[in-house]
From Swiss-Prot:
PANTHER family linked to this entry: BAX INHIBITOR-RELATED, PROTEIN LIFEGUARD 4
Residue spans crossing the bilayer: 21-41, 56-76, 83-103, 109-129, 141-161, 162-182, 202-222
One Pfam family per UniProt: Bax1-I
Superkingdom to which the source organism belongs: Bacteria
Keywords attached to this entry: Cell membrane, Membrane, Transmembrane, Transmembrane helix
Gene Ontology cellular-component annotations: plasma membrane
UniProt family annotation: Belongs to the BI1 family.
Species name: Streptococcus pyogenes serotype M3 (strain ATCC BAA-595 / MGAS315)
Name of the molecule in the record: Uncharacterized membrane protein SpyM3_0260
Subcellular location field: Cell membrane
CDD domains noted in UniProt: BI-1-like_bacterial
InterPro entries: Bax_inhibitor_1-related
Membrane topology: Multi-pass membrane protein
Amino acid sequence: MNDHVIYTQSDVGLNQFFAKIYSLVGMGVGLSAFVSYLMLYPFRENLISILVNQPMIYYGAAIIELILVFVASGAARKNTPAALPIFLIYAALNGFTLSFIIVAYAQTTVFQAFLSSAAVFFAMSIIGVKTKRDMSGLRKAMFAALIGVVVASLINLFIGSGMMSYVISVISVLIFSGLIASDNQMIKRVYQATNGQVGDGWAVAMALSLYLDFINLFISLLRIFGRND
C-alpha cells in the first residue's frame, strides 16, 4: 500500500515537472509566433525593406541568435536566474528571424506546417515518455545525423539543388522527431534518477532543447509543404 502511495506521489511530481517544462516551451513558441506575426503584418513593409535594402540586419540578428542559444543553455545548466529571461529574449529574436523565412510561403502552408509540427511533437513526446526502450543511442545517432545535415545544407548553399534541399528537409523531420522523443525520455529519467531534485535551470535547459526541436521541425515541414509556393 505504501509503495503505491510513493509511486503516485512520484508520478504526480513528474507530471508537474513536465507541465513546468511545457509551459516554458509554450511560452517560447508563443512569443516567437507573436513577434513573427508583428513582422509579417503590422511591420510587413519594414520586413520587405530589410530584405531588399538592409539584409545585414537579418544576418546580424541570426548571429546574435546563435550566440544567445549557447548563452541561454550555459546559464540554464548553471541554474542562474538569468536563464529564463535569456531564453525568452532568444525566442523573441527567433520570431524576428523566422518571419524572413515564413514570408516566402502562403498562409495556408504556414498553418499546415505548424499544425503538423504540433501533431508530430505531441505524438513523439508521448512515445518518448511511454517507451521502455533506452533511446540514448538513438539520441547520439540523431546528433551525428544532424551534423551531416548541417554540412549538406552548407554545400547546398553553393549548389542550389531543389531536390537536395527537399531530401535534407525530410531527413531533418526524422532527426527532430527522434530528438523530441529522446528529450522527453531524458526529462523523465533525470527526474526519476534525482528523486525530483532538479533545479529550475535544468527545466529551462530542457525547455530550450524542446523549443529548438519544435522550431526546426516546423521549418523542415514548411519547406516540404511549401515546395510549390
